[in-house]
Amino acid sequence: MGWKNLILVMALSLLIAACAQQAQTGQPQPTEKNVDALKNGDTSGIITEDVIYFGSSKGFLAKPKNEGVYPAVVMIHEWWGLNDNIKEMARSLAAEGYVVLAVDLYNGKVGKNSTEAGQLAGAIRSNPAVAIQNMKAAVQYLKNLYNVNDDKIASMGWCFGGAMSLQLALNEKLAATVIYYGNLETNSTKLSVIKWPILGIFGSNDTSIPVETVKKFEAALNEVGIENEIHIYEGVGHAFANPSGMNYAPEQTKDAWEKTLEFLDRELKV
């Protein structure tokens, strides 16, 4: 196993433990009410479809109806899988003028409970190279679309997906990276391959990704000159932006989403 895969295995092991800890606090599967909480404005100006982008893996593609060339985002799901929560976030982002491909690292499976989610995430931990290939294929799929500016593609994910967003950045050239409370790499030498800005969203009460680790990550980015914007929301814990979780914090979630849109607009639309 190469050092990159070993690092990814270690990162996923820590993240799976963090997700499991969060699930033990009573985090249920998303419901229709939970999905409604994620809706951010009018999405009537978009179209969506399921697309095959890697082997038999189907992703959820959301894009503006109007003709044009748009920046794009590879969106990566939490440990539950490509569920309705993530699809709603893809719709919301597409409505802001992005082509969004929400990937499926589980090949069609979605965890119905924390045990199933842990097993699905554990399979990725056992074969991390395939997950990297999956996400890299998503980038290439977007580059091949006629309506995508192939110089303006970002990655974005939450929790498990936040960690994978960073891992994609370590393995593929992008234009921006967004990490919501994902496990972090704090070795500046390893991070130095990243040549574009990073947005990080975290909670001060997140015991799985403590503030000390976030600060080390920020310091490592600064050490090698990687532009970054790190926000630590006081008084909220892990997965605070997930309305199906016990830590859901709607005000902080709204603010984080606004900061995410500002960041992506600045890095991808200018």
Task: Describe these PLM feature segments.
Residues 200-202:
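Short beta-strand/loop motif that positions the catalytic acidic residue
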Residues 89, 210-220:
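Short alpha-helix in the alpha/beta-hydrolase fold that links the catalytic acid
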Residues 20-22:
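Bacterial signal peptide processing site
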Residues 24-144, 244:
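Serine-hydrolase catalytic machinery in alpha/beta-hydrolase-like enzymes
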Residues 205-209:
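Acidic catalytic loop of the alpha/beta-hydrolase fold
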Residues 222-270:
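C-terminal catalytic histidine-bearing segment of alpha/beta-hydrolase fold enzymes
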Residues 136-194:
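Primarily recognizes the serine-hydrolase "nucleophile elbow" in alpha/beta-hydrolase
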Residues 16-18:
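C-terminal motif of bacterial Sec signal peptides marking the signal peptidase cleavage site
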